[in-house]
Amino acid sequence: MAHFPGFGQSLLFGYPVYVFGDCVQGDWCPISGGLCSARLHRHALLATCPEHQITWDPIDGRVIGSALQFLIPRLPSFPTQRTSKTLKVLTPPTTHTTPNIPPSFLQAMRKYSPFRNGYMEPTLGQHLPTLSFPDPGLRPQNLYTLWGGSVVCMYLYQLSPPITWPLLPHVIFDHPDQLGAFLTNVPYKRMEELLYKISLTTGALIILPEDCLPTTLFQPARAPVTLTAWQSGLLPFHSTLTTPGLIWAFTDGTPMISGPCPKDGRPSLVLQSSSFIFHKFQTKAYHPSFLLSHGLIQYSSFHNLHLLFEEYTNIPISLLFNEKEADDTDHEPQVSPGGLEPPSEKHFRETEV
C-alpha cells in the first residue's frame, strides 16, 4: 500500500490523520491527551499506547479493551475524551439510515466499465498525477471499486475520525474483488470491519455482491453483479456522458464529474472538469488532490458530494470539453493499412498524464 510521508494534524479539529492500512508513528493518547510515547503506533485499524496499556479505535476514537471488542460499538471510556474539543470529533453527523436508491441509478451503473482485459489493472494509480497536498491534514484515499459494468468511487478521505463522515456518500457500492487504483489486496476482514464501522457511524447503505462476505456480522444489501470486459484498453469517449458517479463543486461553482476517459489513450479513473480547468492547465483530467493543491477546489467543497442520480445522467458535452475536442470518433482502435496493431497495454502504462 502507498505510504505518504509527512503526516500532520487535521485542519478542522487538530486530530491526527491516517492512511488506511499503514502504520503511523504518532497518535493522540486518550489518557494524556497528547503524544505521550514515541512508540505509539497504529496498525490494522487499531492504535495502542504502550505507556498507558490502552488500545483504541482511531477511526471513531472509542477505547476498547481488546481486539476482540473491535466491532462492538461503545461510548468513550475516559473523561478526557469528552472535552469540548474532542466531543465534536467523536460525534458523527446525523445521516439518513434508509436512503432511497432510484432504479434508474442501478440501471445506469451497468453502462460503462473500466475493465482492461477483463479485470481492473492494479497499476491504474500510475496513470494519475503525482499526489501533492498544500497541507498535511488532507490525505485522500480513493477506493475505486467496480460494480457490474461501471466504476464506483468510495471517497474515504483519511479514514481518521469523523471529519471524514460528511464526505461519505449515503450509498456505498463495494466489490472487494475489484479494488483498484490506490488500494490493492485489502484483506476481506479489514474491509468488513471498515464497512461495519461506516454502517454503524453514518447509517450508510452498504451494497455488496451476492456472493461476497456471506458470513458478515452486519446485514448489507445484496445486488447482482454482471461483469463485462471492454475489448479496447480504455473506456471509449462519448459525446454525451451517461455515467453514474459523484458531482464535486469547484471554487467558482462549476461542476466536476467523475466519468470515463475523455480521449483515447488518457486514463479512465480520473475526474473530468468544466471549462474552468482549461483556462488553468489546458486539460480536463486531474486528480482531486492535484486540483486541491492548486486552489481550484476547497476542502469545504467536499461536503457537496452527492450521488449522481437520474437528474444528472445526461451531461452536455459543452460543460466538459472544448469544442475542438468534442470528437467521439477516436475511441475505435486505429489500425493503419500497414497492419500495425493499436497501442498495447505497455503503451498506456507509460503514457504521461
From Swiss-Prot:
The segment annotated Homodimerization runs over: 116-145, 213-248
Briefly state the modifications made to the protein after translation.
Answer: Phosphorylation at Thr-48 results in the loss of NF-kappa-B activation function. Phosphorylation at Thr-215 results in loss of CREB and NF-B responsive promoters activation. Phosphorylation at Thr-184 and Ser-336 have no effect on these Tax functions. Phosphorylation of either Ser-300 or Ser-301 is necessary for localization to nuclear bodies. Thr-48, Thr-184, Thr-215 and Ser-336 are highly phosphorylated, whereas Ser-300 or Ser-301 are only rarely phosphorylated.
* TM stretches of this protein: none
The record's GO CC annotations read: host cell cytoplasm; host cell nucleus
Provide the protein's localization. Answer: Host nucleus; Host cytoplasm
* Region entry Interaction with CREB1, spans: 2-58
Q: Name one GO biological process term.
A: positive regulation of DNA-templated transcription
Report the domain of life of the source organism: Viruses
Looking at the record, which segments are called Interaction with CREBBP/P300?
A: 81-95
GO MF assignments: DNA binding; SH3 domain binding; zinc ion binding
Compositionally biased tracts (Basic and acidic residues): 343-353
Region described as Transactivation: spans on this chain: 289-322
Phosphothreonine is found on: T48, T184, T215
Return the similarity comment. Answer: Belongs to the deltaretrovirus Tax protein family.
User: Record's domain comment?
Assistant: The 48 N-terminal residues contain a non-canonical functional nuclear localization signal (NLS).
Identify this protein by name: Protein Tax-1
Name the source organism: Human T-cell leukemia virus 1 (isolate Zaire EL subtype B) (HTLV-1)
